[in-house]
Amino acid sequence: MAKYNDSKCRICRREGGKLFLKGDRCYTDKCAFDRRPYAPGQHGRARKKNSDYAVQLREKQKVRRMYGLLEKQFHSYFVKADMSKGVTGSNLLSILERRLDNVIYRLGFANSRSQARQMVRHGIFTVNGRKATIPSIQVKVGDVIEVREKNRKMPVIAEAQEVIARRGCPSWLEADGPNFRGVVKALPQREDIQFPMSEQLIVELYSK
């Protein structure tokens, strides 16, 4: 699991946008980025012209930190995406979206990806009836993700329907809150990812 010593709010401010690292708090007026939408530190407000490399690096760091990954694992996903058929950038985002911890987050069973990762490691979910404890599992079309019966009274699980109503569920997933389950209906497409990101900049960075 990727660990950062810096506060999550400072990470968002450094990357210049909300990465939703603190879950529901990011949707409220308590969000630090809404109050101070500039980089942390003494010179955070200063305007500076970034080189092409700096822009590419910043975009890669933003996406990597949003999904909570270390550089080695993120780069391995890029290599896999580059070797697959299709557009490398779109392939990369599809791989990131199909991680089990991200799917748990998208289904509304966790407030953030980091919380989803922790819940998966604790064995709270099953995939196709088998307990899953590896956050990086790549889900496939037709996979059924369920909350284990003994964990269904957890507050964060009980609030799943409310979270889905507030945050929405992507079209490639089907959330069934009352039955504590979700189904992968299709593979995620680029248009399914609403978060503003320029994956082509990441491709350009790693292609140097």
Curated annotation (Swiss-Prot):
A UniProt-annotated Pfam family: S4
Alphabetic keyword roster: Ribonucleoprotein, Ribosomal protein, RNA-binding, rRNA-binding
Every S4 RNA-binding domain range: 98-161
Biological processes per GO annotation: ribosomal small subunit biogenesis; translation
InterPro entries in UniProt: Ribosomal_uS4, Ribosomal_uS4_bac-type, Ribosomal_uS4_CS, Ribosomal_uS4_N, S4_RNA-bd, S4_RNA-bd_sf
GO cellular component: small ribosomal subunit
Alphabetized GO MF terms: rRNA binding; structural constituent of ribosome
Domain of life assignment: Bacteria
Record family assignment: Belongs to the universal ribosomal protein uS4 family.
Summary of subunit composition and partner proteins: Part of the 30S ribosomal subunit. Contacts protein S5. The interaction surface between S4 and S5 is involved in control of translational fidelity.
Reported function: One of the primary rRNA binding proteins, it binds directly to 16S rRNA where it nucleates assembly of the body of the 30S subunit. With S5 and S12 plays an important role in translational accuracy.
Protein name: Small ribosomal subunit protein uS4
Source lineage: Bacteria, Pseudomonadati, Thermodesulfobacteriota, Desulfovibrionia, Desulfovibrionales
Name of encoding gene: rpsD
